[in-house]
Amino acid sequence: MSLDAIKRKISSVQTTAKITNAMKLVATAKLKRQRDRLAAIKEYCHDYYDVIGLLLSVVNDIEFLKIPNAKNRTLYITINSTMGLAGSYNYNVNKLVSKIINEDDITFTIGKKGHDFMRLSNRLHQVNTYLNLNDNDLTFDMSLQIAREALELYSNGEVNKICIIYTKFINAITFEVNNIDVLPFDKTVLTKDNLAETIELAKDNIIFQPNKVELVKKILPTYIATVLYGSLIESKISENASRRNAMDAATKNAKALAEDYKLIYNTLRQGKITREITEIVAGSDD
């Protein structure tokens, strides 16, 4: 390999390192922004789940939420990313999707990478696709729209269960793909031990208008949207953290490769100089 060829390789690798480092910085900024957003809604979500748990605890029978003669299949709302270069983020989501979703199940895919996987798998019934999952698209209104569409399928008996597959953010290097049941309600999840005293008071002292059953039906879209919105933000945090880690590793590898090429370049250049000096000395002796 010539010295000029090695110089071109060094330049190319250094350019790549600059690009991956810039992507790392962008992902870091987005990660912080999404973590701040999650912190802002976390208290609201926890209080909302407490209210739902309280309401369900005083509704003696929630069988009314189960649609008679509904088809025995599940609607899965899957959350992937729109952009790639996010390490194993999308792979892990798709791996769980392949494992638990049956051919008869219905899917709402959020994120282009999820849509591409469903299309290439050629075996899953995909009803709705939301290709864009950029920061500007991540709104509660979007979650509410998807929640209403999902609830319509549930109310019409097209599915008897609604689940969300998302990525839970644990720390900067650890993420966990989860599948959570949204409908039917799981009382054991929503009703916490620390609500026991409040629940006892509610049974006698809280008046529900128009009534408990109608109130549960009214809050269903907002409930699903709240769960989905939290899942979207947490997935977005995991995506950006995974992309930051991937770009950090890529930058380090590119810099290491550039150093290796520089070593090769210097070795070849030193050899060339030595040969030229030897030839000059040999010529002068003649």
Swiss-Prot record:
SUPFAM superfamilies: ATP synthase (F1-ATPase), gamma subunit (SSF52943). GO terms for cellular component: plasma membrane; proton-transporting ATP synthase complex. The keyword Transport applies. GO terms for molecular function: ATP binding; proton-transporting ATP synthase activity, rotational mechanism. It is a peripheral membrane protein. GO terms for biological process: proton motive force-driven plasma membrane ATP synthesis. Its main location: membrane. Keywords: ATP synthesis, Cell membrane, CF(1), Hydrogen ion transport, Ion transport, Membrane, Transport. InterPro entries: ATP_synth_F1_ATPase_gsu, ATP_synth_F1_gsu. The keyword Membrane applies. It is found in: Cell membrane. Produces ATP from ADP in the presence of a proton gradient across the membrane. The gamma chain is believed to be important in regulating ATPase activity and the flow of protons through the CF(0) complex. PANTHER family: ATP SYNTHASE GAMMA CHAIN, ATP SYNTHASE SUBUNIT GAMMA, MITOCHONDRIAL. Belongs to the ATPase gamma chain family. F-type ATPases have 2 components, CF(1) - the catalytic core - and CF(0) - the membrane proton channel. CF(1) has five subunits: alpha(3), beta(3), gamma(1), delta(1), epsilon(1). CF(0) has three main subunits: a, b and c. This is ATP synthase gamma chain. It comes from Ureaplasma urealyticum serovar 10 (strain ATCC 33699 / Western).
